[in-house]
């Protein structure tokens, strides 16, 4: 008897190959992708790279997403596969097999599936992991390594994780069988055929959740707010999407049916009545397709736009090859002599054989303020980006402005040049206790990190250094009275360098280890920070390259899951529609009318998720725009083009997949019992 179970399990899988092969393919692909992601995240070569740590962190996040998503997609496909076999299990039960015997058969089926999925999945991981490592290295600017990339640790973790997952799938299937009786299993194929009831409360709740999620996105206009608002908005939209497909769609269709002028037409009559039943059976699956489609669009469009905008961001972040910032003690009001420090810097670059060019030096004071119309109230608090009225104020004198731009300007006392990345100011600005007459600038060559992070910044050019110090004194007086951080007078020294990145980095290391540099800074009573493009850009490229790789990787996973759900929906709809096809012909409809009616229903049902995903993206655009702003992308036009391009490509792929699976659907519909 026991030898019968393995043979019966193999026969069952072969007989159900139309449903089983896609399920097995899903298992193989998910195993391979998980193992590849785990292999890349734990690649020791990344740890040895100078800037590989950030990439490992990004990929480690991807492993967590893959683990969660693997469980979700395998439970979905397994439940779909099991649902199609309920009648088969009922017949076994009626013919005399006990439920424990069916469990033995299910055990062998699961064992076959797990063995094939792990074997072929790990083989595929071994084949493609090296290729994907080369792609990753190309994106992050690393060098390719030789040898097989997959490691025993990755294989072991994959086997343990999916072994446990397949065990849970088996236990869940056995639970379903043991909790059902043969009559319930025989009727499972026709469950849901009764007309669904209108669920007004759920429909209203779905509309409210969608509206709330959309409203959060539309009202988010600060970059750092966008990050904390993203997940609540996503959760609301996901809940709203499921409730909309499950409840609101039925309510709308029934409302159309009550409209006699619309409903009692040949095409509308059959289409609306058929869609009521189709949406009842397929609402959750269609909502899942919509959510997955939205995830593909968001993931790919954001990572592509960030990577495409990398160089533009770097040019803003590092306007020159080297930036040295000398900061005075905030407790002193003296202007330090920084010339000895700068001489050490220049001498170090000369000894390294590097030539300086485009040398600029200027003094600035930075402090925070709260905007109210054309007035700025001084504040000693740190900038958080928690308000659209929060500004970082950067003040420099006309000498520094001339050094930066080459433009000589003359300002009278109480007058200032002004440029802001926020809303324009009027003719005057009240700052602290003073009122400044403003002359607006069309552009400004100095962009601070606050602009990059999405915080508003105001740049003021005042007549002389004394005016700079006066504004600093006002801010420090406010800080002394209310507590908080006093502002510092900074001297920024910037220049470009000849030579390679490695030569520039060597020169920087030489400078920082030079006792003369330390002693000159101490003598001037200044602290310092250095920022070199040759040091920061590779880290930035590695991080954004890792994001792009993860975006495409997860985008492929989400797309694969979408294709899988569409296939199962088409096949299950095909089997369900075989009987309806005959019934509609028997009541007088011609085969051409029947086919047109069913085609209309299927088209509306399967393209509704794509249309809904497009609506989600349109409403999410303001929120996602602020998030990419926080990561440094300030080019809205580029982000819009990437979003539209991603949607266009995805819509073509979606249509192609639909047409392929539709062929399977029509073959099933035309089959005879």
State the predicted function of each range.
Residues 18-45, 53-87, 110-124, 238, ...:
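Hydrophobic alpha-helical transmembrane segments of multi-pass inner-membrane transport and secretion
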Residues 21-26, 32-36, 160-165, 194-306, ...:
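Alpha-helical transmembrane segments, especially those used as permease/efflux helices
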Residues 31-43, 76-78, 87, 113-142, ...:
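Small-residue-rich transmembrane alpha-helices
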Residues 313-560:
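Basic-flanked hydrophobic alpha-helices used for secretion and membrane insertion
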């Amino acid at each position: 008897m026991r030898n019968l179970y393995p043979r019966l399990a193999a026969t069952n899988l072969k007989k159900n190959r139309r449903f089983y092969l896609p399920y097995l393919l899903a298992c193989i692909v998910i195993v391979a992708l998980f193992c590849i992601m785990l292999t890349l995240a734990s690649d020791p070569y990344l740890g040895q790279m100078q800037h590989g740590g950030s990439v490992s962190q990004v990929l480690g996040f991807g492993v967590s997403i893959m683990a969660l998503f693997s469980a979700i997609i395998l439970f979905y496909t397994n439940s779909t596969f099991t649902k199609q076999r309920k009648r088969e299990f009922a017949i076994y039960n009626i013919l005399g097999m006990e439920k424990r015997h069916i469990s033995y058969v299910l055990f062998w089926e699961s064992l076959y599936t797990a063995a094939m999925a792990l074997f072929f999945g790990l083989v595929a991981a071994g084949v493609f992991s090296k290729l994907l490592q080369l792609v990753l290295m190309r994106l992050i600017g690393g060098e390719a390594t030789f040898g097989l990339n997959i490691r025993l640790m990755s294989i072991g973790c994959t086997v343990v994780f999916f072994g446990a997952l397949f065990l849970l799938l088996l236990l869940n299937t056995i639970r379903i069988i043991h909790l059902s009786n043969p009559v319930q299993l025989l009727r499972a194929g026709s469950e849901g055929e009764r007309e669904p009831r209108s669920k007004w409360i759920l429909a209203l709740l779905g509309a409210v959740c969608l509206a709330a999620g959309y409203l959060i996105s539309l009202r988010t206009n600060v970059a750092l707010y966008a990050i904390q608002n993203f997940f609540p908005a996503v959760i609301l939209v996901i809940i709203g999407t499921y409730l909309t497909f499950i409840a609101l769609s039925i309510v709308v269709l029934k409302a159309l049916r009550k409209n006699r002028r619309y409903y009692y037409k040949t095409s509308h009559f059959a289409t609306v009545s058929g869609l009521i039943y189709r949406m009842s059976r397929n609402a959750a699956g269609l909502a899942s397709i919509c959510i997955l489609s939205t995830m593909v669009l968001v993931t790919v469009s954001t990572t592509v736009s960030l990577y495409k905008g990398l160089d533009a961001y770097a040019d803003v972040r590092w306007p020159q090859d080297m930036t040295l910032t000398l900061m005075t003690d905030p407790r002193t009001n003296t202007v330090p002599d920084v010339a000895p420090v700068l001489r050490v810097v220049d001498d170090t670059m000369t000894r390294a054989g590097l030539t300086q060019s485009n040398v600029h030096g200027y003094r600035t004071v930075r402090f925070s303020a709260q905007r109210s119309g054309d007035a700025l109230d001084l504040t000693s608090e740190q900038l958080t980006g928690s308000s659209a009225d929060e500004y970082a104020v950067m003040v420099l004198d006309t000498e520094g402005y001339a050094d930066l731009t080459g433009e000589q300007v003359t300002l009278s006392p109480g007058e200032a040049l002004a440029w802001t990345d926020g809303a324009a100011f009027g003719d005057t600005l009240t700052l602290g206790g003073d009122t400044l007459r403003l002359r607006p600038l069309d552009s400004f060559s100095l962009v601070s990190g606050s602009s990059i992070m999405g915080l508003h910044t105001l740049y003021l050019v005042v007549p002389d250094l004394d005016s700079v110090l006066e504004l600093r004194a006002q801010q420090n007086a406010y800080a002394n009275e209310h507590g908080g951080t006093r502002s510092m007078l900074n001297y920024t020294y910037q220049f470009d360098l000849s030579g390679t990145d490695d030569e520039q980095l060597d020169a920087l290391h030489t400078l920082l280890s030079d006792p003369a540099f330390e002693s000159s800074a101490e003598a001037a009573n200044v602290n310092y920070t250095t920022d070199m493009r040759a040091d920061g850009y590779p880290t930035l490229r590695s991080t954004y390259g890792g994001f792009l790789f993860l975006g495409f990787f997860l985008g492929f996973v989400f797309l694969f899951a979408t294709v899988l759900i569409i296939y199962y929906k088409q096949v299950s709809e095909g089997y369900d529609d075989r009987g309806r096809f005959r019934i509609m012909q028997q009541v007088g409809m011609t085969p051409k009318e029947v086919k047109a009616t069913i085609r209309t229903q299927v088209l509306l049902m399967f393209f509704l998720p794509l249309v809904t995903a497009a609506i989600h993206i349109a409403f999410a655009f303001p929120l996602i725009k602020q998030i990419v702003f926080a990561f440094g992308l300030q080019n809205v036009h580029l982000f819009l083009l990437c979003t539209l391009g991603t949607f266009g490509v995805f819509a073509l792929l979606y249509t192609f997949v639909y047409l392929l699976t539709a062929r399977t659907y029509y073959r099933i519909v035309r089959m005879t019992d």
